[in-house]
């Protein structure tokens, strides 16, 4: 993922 919440 490219997001911290993935």
Curated annotation (Swiss-Prot):
GO terms for cellular component: extracellular region. One of its GO terms (molecular function) is toxin activity. Transmembrane segments: none annotated. The modification 4-hydroxyproline is found at residue 4. The modification Cysteine amide is found at residue 6. Keywords: Amidation, Disulfide bond, Hydroxylation, Ion channel impairing toxin, Secreted, Toxin. Disulfide bonds join 1-6. Expressed by the venom duct. It is found in: Secreted. Belongs to the O2 superfamily. Contryphan family. The cysteine framework is C-C. Its target is unknown, but this toxin may modulate voltage-activated calcium channels (Cav) or calcium-dependent potassium channels (KCa). This is Contryphan Co838/Co854. It comes from Conus coronatus. The lineage of its organism: Eukaryota, Metazoa, Spiralia, Lophotrochozoa, Mollusca.
